[in-house]
Amino acid sequence: MADTLGIHGESVTQAVRGAVFLCDAETLIGKADLKKFELTAEKVELTASGSESAKTFYNMGHMSNDTLPEFSLDGGDATNLSTWLEASFRTSYNETTGKVTFSSVQGDKTTLKTIYNAVDMPDNVGIAFGLVKTPVAKSVLILWQDTNTGERSALLLPNLDLAFSNLPSLSTDKFTEYGMEGSIKTSKKLPKDASGKYCSVAIFDTADFKAV
């Protein structure tokens, strides 16, 4: 039976609370594992599939409540092409690139090493990192929950080049923030779209978290 549009009030959500999970690049999440993702889950071990060993998504913990994850697209401008016979005969779109930014407020060593791709100091006190960014490919799940209804939704970026966006952002009236940014790439693990091109993003709606 084909899907049809309709009124689905249970899918109207507010991102009241949320979490960001990291895993190895090109890791997808199946139906049986999706419901394991809770805001306070320290980690979620996925079910092993075929010859692949089980992968684990790790919760980044406390993220900024002031600087929520933000997505941006560059390019994708439309061009209308006309024929001599007919105006606006065809529309084409320029190539589009995507980016996501989010900020952690946890300043523990493990989190900072992940954000800044840092190394331990010689005496194991403190960490060090360069200002030249070296992106690390990750699969990133951004989970949000409407605490008024308990409904969860999520967005998966299976192939994200992740790096720090800036040095720590200090404040006297809110938590110190450690920003990250990621370039969204296509994933060969995701299905192809209707035009035969690889996809870059997967979205899980409220019903997906209840699927059996």
What are these model-derived regions, one by one?
Residues 89-112, 173-188:
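Oligomerization/assembly interface segments of phage tail-like spikes and tubes
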Residues 1-61:
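Polar/acidic, low-complexity leader/linker segments enriched in S/T/G and N/D
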